């Protein structure tokens, strides 16, 4: 049975803060559970809701003007959410409401509200690239890798896209300019900034405050549309979150990285936006072609990949002076797979100071072996490479999260061999090491190649963990 707390024995100020917030005298249990949240609760209580309503309306006018909703509906939704706690008696749900309201009152203005004020002048920094000259070369490279056999009986997961993506993209373009120290983009949109002929869907981003940003954005969409918005966390993707609507339609996703990782990611500046250096993106594309699913994507839409590949090839030609003459020297580097222990040995002595690289296909095994080495100098680049790297006694140790394709029993397919080489080169770029000669040889090794069928492939490392989510409507946070 709930009893009101004895006001003579409890701190009156804290009690009053909680009482004002709940719109009722708290029970003894509510008081003792919420008293440590008094500071956050007070910030929520004194928060100027009128200014917040005005900011959301301005965001709506600028980025969601085609959404049919009135100013009064937006205001009602906001005021309703900020009074939701008065009708909530479950302690867990109250904690969720306090946490999410706290994010809004402390961060929304700086993260999304700022997008409504006049922006700095855009510094035009585009270079004219002759992408057309690379299209035939890109097509030849991709054609030799178009070797996946599509299983028509295989049920593919559908990726439903929300109609709000175009609105969010418009917002993201401005967000990337205003927050270019903490948020950068990669993928199709970043290449579109170099080559306007590139088609893109949603905008792929890396940022240092992903969770806060996505919560603020989810509430903005909720207040404008009235839809229930859900944030999901996927266990096998590091520090990844996605916003979906109540019908499971994809709106936007984001990877979170540390600031020290952000600082070392190679990037270039275009129109006040930082994008991941296309050289780095090209290496990632080569690496990802070792993933059987990505080769299946290539088989379905080769022209989409061709436009991207040609753009990146032209960028590296222009930026690094790469000559495409077919001289590949020792590329791809020799790769020998131990299928039982799931380790690939790459001979690196022709290019780097370390003589070989041991590439683990199971991350937990690598972690265990690094502990056994008693070495504490490993580099973890989080979702940028999906791997740690360690150089110890002239040997590199790293993890490869993709499948390994085989062209025959026990023989690594050249597509995967190049992917492994690209994975090593990502480390070189991130640590400001030498990579240009190796890059030149790697790209030239992709020229004038015949198609080699896939004999089989290794399975990807299985990641443990559970899906997490934030359900705003139901006041649930599970992480």
Curated annotation (Swiss-Prot):
Pfam families: Pox_polyA_pol (PF03296), Pox_polyA_pol_C (PF12629), Pox_polyA_pol_N (PF12630). InterPro entries: PolyA_pol_cat_Poxvir, PolyA_pol_cat_sf, PolyA_pol_nucTrfase_Poxvir, PolyA_pol_nucTrfase_sf_Poxvir, Poxvirus_polyA_pol_cat_C, Poxvirus_polyA_pol_cat_N, Poxvirus_polyA_pol_cat_N_sf. It catalyses: RNA(n) + ATP = RNA(n)-3'-adenine ribonucleotide + diphosphate. Heterodimer of a large (catalytic) subunit and a small (regulatory) subunit. GO terms for molecular function: ATP binding; metal ion binding; poly(A) RNA polymerase activity. The active site is at residues 202, 204. Induction: Expressed in the early phase of the viral replicative cycle. Ca(2+) 2 binds at residues 202, 204, 253. One of its GO terms (biological process) is mRNA processing. Polymerase that creates the 3'-poly(A) tail of mRNA's. Belongs to the poxviridae poly(A) polymerase catalytic subunit family. Ca(2+) 1 binds at residues 202, 204. Keywords: ATP-binding, Calcium, Early protein, Metal-binding, mRNA processing, Nucleotide-binding, Transcription, Transferase. This is Poly(A) polymerase catalytic subunit. Its EC number is 2.7.7.19.
């Amino acid at each position: 049975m709930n009893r009101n707390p004895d006001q003579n024995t409890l701190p009156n100020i804290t009690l009053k803060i909680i009482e004002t917030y709940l719109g009722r005298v708290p029970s003894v249990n509510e008081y003792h559970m919420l008293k440590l949240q008094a500071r956050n609760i007070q910030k929520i209580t004194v928060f100027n809701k009128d200014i917040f309503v005005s900011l959301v309306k301005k965001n709506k006018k600028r980025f969601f003007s085609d959404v049919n909703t009135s100013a009064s509906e937006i205001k009602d939704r906001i005021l309703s959410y900020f009074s939701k706690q008065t009708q909530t008696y479950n302690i867990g749900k109250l904690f969720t409401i306090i946490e999410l309201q706290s994010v809004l009152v402390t961060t929304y203005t700086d993260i999304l509200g700022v997008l409504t004020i006049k922006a700095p002048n855009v510094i035009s920094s585009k270079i004219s690239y002759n992408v057309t000259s690379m299209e035939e070369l890109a097509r030849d490279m991709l054609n030799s890798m178009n070797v996946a056999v599509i299983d028509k009986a295989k049920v593919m997961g559908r990726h439903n896209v929300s109609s709000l993506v175009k609105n969010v993209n418009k917002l993201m373009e401005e967000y990337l300019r205003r927050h270019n120290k903490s948020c950068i983009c990669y993928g199709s949109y970043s290449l579109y900034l170099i080559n306007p002929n590139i088609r893109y869907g949603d905008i792929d981003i890396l940022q240092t405050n992903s969770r806060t940003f996505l919560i603020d954005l989810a509430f903005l969409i909720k207040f404008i549309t009235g839809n229930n918005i859900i944030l999901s966390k996927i266990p096998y993707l590091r520090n990844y979150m996605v916003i979906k609507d109540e019908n499971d339609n994809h709106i936007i996703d984001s990877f979170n990285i540390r600031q020290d990782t952000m600082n070392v990611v190679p990037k270039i500046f275009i129109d006040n936006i930082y994008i991941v250096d296309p050289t780095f993106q090209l290496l990632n594309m080569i690496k990802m072609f070792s993933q059987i699913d990505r080769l299946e994507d290539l088989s379905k839409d080769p022209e989409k990949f061709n436009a991207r590949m040609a753009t990146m090839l032209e960028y590296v030609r222009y930026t690094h002076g790469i000559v495409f003459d077919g001289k590949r020297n020792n590329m791809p580097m020799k790769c020998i797979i131990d299928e039982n222990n799931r380790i690939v040995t790459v001979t690196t002595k022709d290019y780097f100071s370390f003589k070989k690289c041991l590439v683990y296909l199971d991350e937990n095994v690598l972690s265990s072996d690094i502990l056994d080495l008693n070495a504490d100098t490993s580099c973890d680049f989080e979702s940028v490479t999906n791997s740690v790297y360690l150089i110890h006694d002239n040997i590199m140790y790293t993890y490869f999260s993709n499948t390994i394709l085989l062209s025959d029993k026990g023989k690594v397919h050249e597509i995967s061999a190049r992917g492994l080489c690209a994975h090593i080169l990502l480390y070189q770029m991130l640590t400001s090491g030498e990579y240009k000669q190796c890059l030149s040889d790697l790209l030239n090794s992709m020229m004038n190649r015949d198609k080699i069928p896939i004999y089989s492939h290794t399975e990807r490392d299985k990641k443990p963990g559970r899906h997490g989510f934030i359900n705003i409507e139901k006041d649930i946070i599970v992480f």
